[in-house]
Each structure stands twice: as C-alpha cells, then as structure tokens.
C-alpha cells in the first residue's frame, strides 16, 4: 500500500483518486473548497464535479495542503495549468523528501508555453524530486467514475518510474501502458484540446462528418508537426495520447472542449461559453500557447491559427472555415517526410 496525495479535487482528480483507492492505496485528496472536502469525507461524493458517483470511503479529503502532504512521497497533480506554479510553491514547503511527482493535467502553461513537467522541475528543488511522471490518454472522468474500461499511458524519462506508476494504477477497468517519450505524451494530451474545440465548432455549424473527419486528421498532423519540432517521437502521436485522446475528445459530449466549441459554432461568444461551462476549458489557453510556440518555432499550424483568430481576434467561425478550405493546394504528407 502506497500513501498518495491527489492535489486537485475536480472531476479528473476525483476519478483518479477512486482508481487508486480501489487498488488499496492510502489515498488523500486536497481541494480548496472546504465544503466539498467535507462532502467527500461524510457523503463520499463529489457532487459538484463528479455527481452520482459513490467514492470509496477510504479516500480522506483535506482543505489543508500541509495536512494532506504529511508522510507522503507520491503526489498526483490534477489542477488547471495556470495554477501550477502557485500550487507547487505551496507544496514544496511541506514535502519532506524525494517524491514522485505525477501529473495528469492536459495543457501548456499560459505565458511561458512550457510543458507541465518543465514547470514542476523549475519550481521543485532537485532534492525533492525522485521522478516526474505524466499520466495521459483518452479518459473521461465520468466513465472512469463508472469504472468503465479505460486505457492510458504513463510516461517518464526513467522507464522504471513509468512502470512504478503503471503498477499504482493498473486494475481490471483501468489499463496503463508505458512510454519513455514524456515530451510527445504531454504535447499530445495538451494539443488535442485545440482540435476538439475546432471539432465542436464544425458540429455547431452543422458541417457534417466529412468536415469533422478531415479536421481531426489534419489536426493530428499539426500536433505531430509541432511535437516533432519540440523533440517528441512521431509514433507517440499515433498512440493513446495522440490519436486516441483526439478521437475521444472530438467525438464525445463529455468533452468540455468539444462542448465549448459546439457553443461557439452555434453563435455564442467566448465569454458566454466560458461562463456557461462552469469548469476549466484548457483548449482556450492552449490555443494561445500553441499559436505562440508555432510562430516562435516556425511550424505551420493553420487550424490552430484559424482558431486563435476566432478566440482572440474576433474572427467569425464561418470565415475561419472558409479560410482553411481556401488555402493553397498542398501535398498531404509533405510536412512529415520522415514518416514516409
């Protein structure tokens, strides 16, 4: 039995805490809403973020980060990307020794465009880091909460660390593969949110299956293009954290990013969409970060650029579709010649 603290009591953090508790681990979960932590402890439910799911009674919730981290050497971070530095700066005051830092957040840090593992390594002193591991893949919290079959990937620079995390999570309904490509796994999980927003827009506009299939396929090309430039393995983007996560996020009503895009496609403003969602839509911030990265690294990402103009420059969604369809003719695979 391993002592694990889950930092972040949203839908995904709560679902992963359930998986770990089902596996017999000593699981604590921290959140900044004391009434929500009280509900988890007394009613064994997170009615705000994962309603209708009865949580194992062994999960103990804390609103004090200091108390949640006592005698723990494995932490699972599941907080919005914009909150990472602030949370990590608090956490390092209370972590006593070398710790395995797992993160399951799919995004890029706003402002710096850095991957979350890079943020962890910048904020946490070396003597407090045993390993940094990423957990990512096609995984809606709602389905994991129902213990429906789910498969994800554990990635770390040190394969033994990825395998240790694999062992922590594996059970009859939650399968975990390993991958040494931490860059590709993080980028696949983050960048697919951009394409999911765009897929939601195509559905909101009623453009049909042909358009959506093309968008997802060309979107995956963009993800792989930037991922390769940043050091990711092209094969990673054909796996669970690339194609797999892209499919589930672009086609499911559980997807916040798809739902947000769908509302945009139906004519709602970004402000209206974000207000109505009530939860973080990482794809909005990730679009900005990826657009900045693409310009800096001179990587062609036309779908990302078109979505950026819709979100941040007020471009009309129909005009964005027209601009993509009217681009100069191209060879389909010219951008990824080493895959031929």
Swiss-Prot record:
Disulphide bridges: none
Residues where NADPH binds: 11-12, 33, 106, 141, 256, 280, 282
Substrates-to-products reaction catalysed: sn-glycerol 3-phosphate + NAD(+) = dihydroxyacetone phosphate + NADH + H(+); sn-glycerol 3-phosphate + NADP(+) = dihydroxyacetone phosphate + NADPH + H(+)
Stored Gene3D superfamilies: N-(1-d-carboxylethyl)-l-norvaline Dehydrogenase, domain 2, NAD(P)-binding Rossmann-like Domain
Enzyme class: oxidoreductase
Residues of the active site: 192 (proton acceptor)
InterPro entries (UniProt xref): 6-PGluconate_DH-like_C_sf, 6PGD_dom2, G3P_DH_NAD-dep, G3P_DH_NAD-dep_C, G3P_DH_NAD-dep_N, NAD(P)-bd_dom_sf
Family indicated by similarity: Belongs to the NAD-dependent glycerol-3-phosphate dehydrogenase family.
Name under which the protein is recorded: Glycerol-3-phosphate dehydrogenase [NAD(P)+]
């Amino acid at each position: 039995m391993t002592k694990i603290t889950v930092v972040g009591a949203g839908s995904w953090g709560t679902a992963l805490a359930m998986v770990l508790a089902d596996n017999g681990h000593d699981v604590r979960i921290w959140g900044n809403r004391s009434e929500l932590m009280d509900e988890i402890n007394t009613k064994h439910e997170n009615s705000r973020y994962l309603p209708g799911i009865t949580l194992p009674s062994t999960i103990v919730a804390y609103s004090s980060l200091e108390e949640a981290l006592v005698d723990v050497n494995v932490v699972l971070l599941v907080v919005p990307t914009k909150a990472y530095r602030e949370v990590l700066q608090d956490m390092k005051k209370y972590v006593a020794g070398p710790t395995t830092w797992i993160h399951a957040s799919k995004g890029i840090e706003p402002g710096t465009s850095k991957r979350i593992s890079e943020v962890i390594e910048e904020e946490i002193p070396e003597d407090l880091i045993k390993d940094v591991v990423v957990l990512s893949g096609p995984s809606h919290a709602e389905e994991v909460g129902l213990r429906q079959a789910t498969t994800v990937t554990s990635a770390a620079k040190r394969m033994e660390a990825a395998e240790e995390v694999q062992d922590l999570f594996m059970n009859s309904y939650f399968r975990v593969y390993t991958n040494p490509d931490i860059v590709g796994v993080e980028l696949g999980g983050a960048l697919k949110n951009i394409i999911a927003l765009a897929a939601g827009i195509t559905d909101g506009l009623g453009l049909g299956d042909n358009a959506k299939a093309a968008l997802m396929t060309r979107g995956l090309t963009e993800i792989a293009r930037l991922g390769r430039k940043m050091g990711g393995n092209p094969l990673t983007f054909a796996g669970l954290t690339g194609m797999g996560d892209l499919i589930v996020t672009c086609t499911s009503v559980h997807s916040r990013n798809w739902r947000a895009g769908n509302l945009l496609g139906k004519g709602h403003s970004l402000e209206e969409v974000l207000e109505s969602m009530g939860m973080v839509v990482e794809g909005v911030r990730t679009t900005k970060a990826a657009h900045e990265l693409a310009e800096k690294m001179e990587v062609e990402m036309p779908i990302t650029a078109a979505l950026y103009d819709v979100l941040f420059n007020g471009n009309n969604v129909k005009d964005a579709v027209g601009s993509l369809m009217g681009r100069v003719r191209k060879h389909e695979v010219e951008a990824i010649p080493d895959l031929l």
